[in-house]
UniProtKB/Swiss-Prot annotation:
PANTHER family: LETM1 DOMAIN-CONTAINING PROTEIN LETM2, MITOCHONDRIAL, LEUCINE ZIPPER-EF-HAND CONTAINING TRANSMEMBRANE PROTEIN. Residues 107-118 have a biased composition (Basic and acidic residues). This is LETM1 domain-containing protein LETM2, mitochondrial. The gene is Letm2. It comes from Mus musculus. Residues 1-25 form a transit peptide. It is found in: Mitochondrion inner membrane.
Amino acid sequence: MAFYSYNSFLAIFWTRLPGHSVYPSCSHFPSLAFLHLPDSHLRTAYIKNCGSRKYSYPSLTGNNKVHPLRTRLPQKLHTTCWLQHVPGKPQLEQTGKPKAASPQPTKEAKTETTEEKRSLRQKIVNELKYYYKGFSLLWIDTKVAARIVWRLLHGNALTRRERRRLLRTCADVFRLVPFMVFIIVPFMEFLIPVFLKLFPDMLPSTFESESKKEEKQKKTMAAKLEIAKFLQETMTEMARRNRAKLGDASSQLSSYVKQVQTGHKPSTKEIVRFSKLFKDQLALEHLDRPQLVALCKLLELQTFGTNNLLRFQLLMTLKSIKADDEIIAKEGVKALSVSELQSACRARGMRSLGLTEEQLCQQLTGWLDLHLKENVPPSLLLLSRTFYLIDVKPKPIELPPNIETPKPNLGIPTPPPPESKENLTDSAPQLKGTKDEEFIQLPPVPSSLIAPAATISKEAILQAKSQETSQNSKADSKGA
């Protein structure tokens, strides 16, 4: 009877429920859920598993037979009951297979790839801009050179600046002649980058950047400094060999060279005085090969060939320099720009970097005075330029001995706080200031008996302590 009433109660309960209800079958298997279909004649439960087959189990309705499922589920059911945390029981992990994370590229990888692409693209763009600017400047120079040639054909005189520009553009145009071979021969234009890598000086001067120019000038300047030291040593050695002829002049020359090496600026009078001693010995005909090579490096010339070829090369360059000196003397040194001053000093074997405009003008005027007015031989002129090619480092500022160095603590010392007085000062001078009390002072100890702290013996220390205790006891008795 009780069992029948229980079944009838369940039947009424299921008929009143909505179309279908889903609840988890067991807390230990949260991924499983029972599906109950309302039917008065059929009470079966169907297990719903995520992505698995569906099996029917008899419900507790009292029916002994299990009827097969003839109805098709209209849709897949999903429950979130397995996500709820049951208190007192550990929450199990989801039995379903975790989805593989899609391989999405991170932001850093994206930025790296974009930077690489940009850098490669930027390199190509920079190279194209570089060649475009070089060819555009070359085209402008050729147009200006054509106008200069037209003026020259009509009998007009050229200035130094126009003449140098015409020579430079002609040299740049002739540098492009070897590239015609690469254009004429088929498939040979692919070797142009290799050719430029092996011979970078084959490009015209308009393709040379300022940074490359500065690096090249620094390298040549370092080489010239070493050459100047070598030439100074040769001059001192020649003076030592000819001590009998020169006499005191050899010692004066050696001392003068030492002064110049320490930073003394040579004057034109001193150079003329010492150049008269080497008129015959320092001629180009009497110079050896190492000296000729050093002079060629000083003028930035090639050092290949025999001694006669080097002498001829030096003579031709010195003649062109003399003609240039005459033009500069006519136009004036002040008419030159800074770049022109640097190039003129560099062509004459003088320093061109690390100097102001005034210093460059002084160097060039000194060269003109020696070459045109004093008629100094060209070889002696070049050797005299070695005195200007000395790497002088700035000396530290030295104070005279009378002036004392300022002390760091210049402020007025502030009196210490009272707490520090009690701890650090002696109590004897404080007690001397009291009016109603008198104390016996210790007799002064002669200075001859005072020994340093390191040599005082233990006995003397004990005697001094005993005297202090006796005096303190007497003072206490008098006070009482």
